[in-house]
């Protein structure tokens, strides 16, 4: 995955596409034209959707679409949700399901090697496990998840997503 606005990213997308590899946008601030160009080049997936991707924003007095809205508007682009209930709240999970549907949505744990390690000691001073998630030690940002896929399915069901659809998105 790559930020499509970075130098060489679109060439990378075209290369992946030529090899039959699914390319993904991530950690990007691309707006609609950038996402459209990225999709056409071969980035057909949005990894860790909503994470390090802005929604609509203002520049001076004008509003602009963000990466999130641009991905929603790109028919055929699939999304990946970290549905641990921490990275994304249930309202966002419902919105993504409603707009992209089961066919264009998949679940990802984003789990570090500390999956299911709540309450256990870890050997990396750069991160802590707290509140059911990995955080940077200074608590300035999330560093990953400790959720397992079954937890993601349960989180989706708690968000009123049908069990069959939650399982399909997880597989």
Kindly label every feature range from the protein language model:
Residues 63-81, 97-109, 114-171:
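His/Asp/Glu-enriched, well-ordered alpha-helical/loop segment
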Residues 1-117:
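Active-site core of metal-dependent hydrolases
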